[in-house]
Amino acid sequence: LDSHKVSQYASVTDFLVSSAAQSSERKLERARKAVKSQLATKLDDVEVRYEYTTVFNGLSVEANYADLEAIQDLPGVKDAYVSQVYQLIEPVNETKLADSVPAIGGDISQKTGYTGKGMVVAILDTGLDTSHEAFRNAVNAPKFTKQDIADKLASDSLRVGNVNVKSIYQSDKIPFAYDYYDDDTNVSGGNSHGTHVAGIVGANSGQVTGVAPDAQLMIMKIFGDDGSGAYDSDIIAALEDAVVLGADAVNMSLGMTAGFSEAAATKTREVYQRVKNAGISLMCAAGNEYSSSYKSAGGTDLPLASNPDNGAVASPSTYDAALSVASMNNVKATAPYLLVGDRKIRYSDPAETASKQIASLNDTYEYVACGVGATSDFTGKTLTYKVALIQRAGEENGEILSFAQKEKNAKAAGAKAVIIYD
């Protein structure tokens, strides 16, 4: 909308509680009210979801796409565009905090006193398992108390529904938790990605320690429980509240490698710049698509030799205001192994079940070499309570021996388990 933005002033947090802020807010509210009145009288099926004041003066509405131009032409409307949708940045491999934090020097920073004490990080993600033991310990010198959050709710300056402090304040570790996607305070029902990210940032238990174990975490759920993407409208609402609440940093492990239309991207870039101007460190994932050929139809994830391509970086991490954070593979990983004498041999269990049967063996077994696992390879061999050691590939009766057939033959011969090697 056409009008001044509160974030144009020097200190956003201080300004928001001043008399000047109240005066500006009334002017901004009148501008939004005029536009809302026109939306209601000139268009059908329009619902206002959010009103923004801090990072920009505007509205988020649900309307028919056919009415976009009509909305753009309304008096007082500077621009209107369709909300962009971002996807999660999924990890390329499983990581363990015990190894990943030291891999980036997090343990060194903690030893020098940088533990996140007195700091608050807003995590815009899929939510959090609030009962997880990694977030149960009390915070040393928390920045926000329960009363602080209650005061913010009472000021009616947040973009949350009709909630009370009892439902939104989880603990001094998690002083704020809200689901912007579903407009409620249940942040525990989504993908575990958010809990994983929150653990990296601020886990603090006897088992795992994050980069900033003494930091408070504001959990701002912006993804649906079904894995659907995060909309700009919800993201901006969460960013507004992060500014109003006074977060020191914002973490967003989301992005879109291909980017968006120039008009929408320009407006979003301005919003992120104002968040930075408010003194907040804005950290966004660079993404894991090292090339625009990643997950392409070619099936190799590699570019053509005739078109070698360049690395691809996800938006919004490409905005000037954001610190683009690239991923790195963990230098260590835990893996199951078989112990043969003093030698540890890694293995992979391809079973698609939550409980791996091989783990239930828990004993010492003799192994017997059984060729490629054809029926004839078991002739004359005693396999009761023993493990069949079978080579990959091979044929039987002119047919290629599948893993399933090898296992079937071994079971018929009385084997306790099967190990297939290449």
How should these model regions be labeled?
Residues 108-231, 245-248, 276-277, 292-294, ...:
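Subtilisin-like serine protease catalytic core
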Residues 20-26, 56-58, 109-111, 183-188, ...:
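Second-shell loop/turn segments in exported
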Residues 117, 204, 219-321, 327-336, ...:
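Substrate-binding/access-modulating region of protease and related hydrolase catalytic domains
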Residues 24-27, 31-35, 64-67, 105, ...:
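Stable alpha-helical elements in mature extracytoplasmic
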Residues 1-90:
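Inhibitory N-terminal propeptides of secreted protease zymogens
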Residues 49-51, 60-72, 90-140, 178-193, ...:
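N-terminal domain-start motif of subtilase-like serine proteases
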Residues 63, 72, 81-84, 121-123, ...:
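Glycine-rich, histidine-containing beta strand-loop boundary motifs that form or position
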Residues 10, 73, 82, 90-95, ...:
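Short, solvent-exposed loop/turn and secondary-structure capping segments
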